Amino acid sequence: MGQHIVLQGGVDYNPGIVAAFQSAYGDRVQVSPVFSISGAYGAALLAQEAVGDALSRFVGFDSPAKDAEDSRSAEIQKNIDFYKQADKLLLEGYTGKRDPRKKTVGVPFALMIHKFFPMTNAFFTSLGFNVVLTDPTSEETIRLAQKTAQGETCYPVKLIYGHMQQLIDQKVDYIFLPTIHTMKHEKSRVKHNYGCVYMQTAAVSIANALDIESKGITLLSPVFDFDFGQEAMASAMLGLSKILGIPKPFCAKALLSGAMAVRRHTAAVEKQGKALLATLRPDDKVLVLITRNYGVSDPILNMGIPELLLERGYKVITLSHLPGHALDISDEYDNLYYPFGQHILSGAKLIAHHPNLYAVYLTNHGCGPDTMLSHLFKQEMGDKPYLQIEVDEHFSNVGVITRIEAFLNSLQHRPAVALPTDFNIEQVDIHPCRLAQTPSPNVPLYLPAMGAYTPYLAAYFKQQGADPYELPHLTDDILSLGRAETSAKEYLPFPALLGSILAERKNDQTPAQFLIPQTQGAEADGQYARVIRAVLDRRKELNAQLVSPMLETLPEMAQNCDALFRALLAGDILYAAPADKRADISAQWDALPGWEQLHTAAREIGALLTKGRRIAAVGTPLCLTELDSGVLAALEAEGEQVLRAPLSEALWFLWKDNLDDNKPSAGWLDQMQRQMQTLGNELGAHSAFAEDAETLFLIADSALPNFSGGNGRYRYAKAVELSSRTNAVLTLAPRYENTAMILDMRGLHDACSAPLFQLSLDNDWDETAWSRLRSFLYYC
């Protein structure tokens, strides 16, 4: 330290910091009179040196509002008119007028209404109803949403509360918001194309939360299952005839009018985009707003970005202007079950391919699918620059403008590229990527650490000719490796799995296989394997192969399902035993116990006395075994009896829920149900198995019909079932998991007979969390 010390920076607002320096260095310390802006002043000096005599291209924060009409050139106005034309096409034919002699259908301007409003308007007006669409999201919408919303959903879903409340205040007779279960993408080849878990549930959940029925309003929420064709959608819409009191033939005619309106709108927007692309010059730079339909035109969800870009003289189009639906990317993304994801990545390919196009990619805070898609989007864009901004309710206008200015400035230095004479925007590169369903022999196969299940799963794979090993248990260092590759609010299992693979690769670069199962949708966890593959490819880990069987179809695809189920049951039976008895029980078994050994152990455990409170634990498999920060083991050590939802039962439920994929195995599934029932009877008071597993479907169907994602139907039903015979229920899920939020929105707390406590896991369990849990258990 020298003799003259000057403290700078906003930290000097803290007098304790200043006093600490002065106590150490005395009068040598002075506080700069401009300490709070010294960094900005230094950055300005550096910028001045870099610019030299050149003129700045910065147009100022207030420029869009300053003499806007006078300063716009004809070209800018033309671009603005072009962009706004899509919104005009969406609302074509809508008046918003209310005839007091007619009943009124209110429509929240949210989610898929941004695609289906032409159909909605044509359908209901043809039937003689008034149609009232809520205004575009405003500060008042946000205020109402913040006042009435339950839980931390993604921002687009949270805004629905505000839109519905506005319709309640307008005293409409009906509120129309469809439930999107599946939505077919034209070129998709996946088994099912799911809407996200919120699209599958939001309409009913929010209507119930706002209690619209008590206010004399009826919810119209037909379930759209586009995977089953237009007939399925027609059937869903025609099903409204009974509620509306209108004969089906009249509804059918109105539906035809609505369907034609949607097709006209889609074709008109794509025609617009094709015409614009045909007029581009080599030095033109067109910005493509990449997000879902509702994120494009909603003035809050798009954060005013289209206007900011247009005001700066750029042409702006949206994903809908590009022929994204014409691309088949199935060979590269064979299990991308989100239709929006397919469209977004198709758009990314088109943008990366066209030299004049640049992406502005908007993601949503709290959106599970976006946490995975953003990795794949980055891979598609390669070296081409793009701007990605996460949308949430706390965004800063100044921050958005600053990022836009920096991005546009970088584009100024991109050289102009003339299109080849034979250029075809749809001729993009496809890089086939097929993840193996079964392991290769003679190559080490690493299994995720899953507590008591891992040794028996390893024995199962060894019987099938594999060379199995267990991945390391989660540590802070391993999690840091995984999180170094994350960019958003990825669920905890993703960085944990990725980090464990990267940790293993640091020690050994020889060929290896890693087991990361997939699902058919619709939670983010089904995409872990494909995104981890993308990360490994970027890191040139070509010797690391993934084995990613589809969980829903294991009964049809797996070798020796009987042995696989015994491996799962072995872990379930060990967890049913008191913790201090588990080692002795497993020591009596073969590497993979047979049926007689399992039943003998179950009877021995059933003969033991139970002690302590009975606490149910229901959640995702990794959270119940490896990612709970030792909470369940600690409770057992304190004398509590923890009844963990059996993994065998959870997968059996998933397989039965997807019986169309497993019909040849229906008889085997019935046999396994009988085995679980027998084992449950033998375990007695130690059993976490349902006495009659079929009752789980009755509970699930009443609360979450037409739902796919995170095995949420089982988790809901199991929590309710266990609550009738336990003192408390703990639900364990990764923080930010959308399915966990859905279960809460569907009233799981109220449905359970015992008190319920949610463990939202992100590897940060601490004394404060323990205090909350202990306070909860004290009253159970």
Protein language model features and the residues they cover:
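An N-terminal assembly and electron-transfer interface module characteristic of large anaerobic redox
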Residues: M1, P15, S23, D27-R28, ...
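Glycine-rich beta-strand-to-loop/alpha-helix junction loops that act as flexible
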Residues: G2-Y13
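FAD-binding beta-loop-beta segment adjacent to the flavin cofactor pocket
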Residues: V18
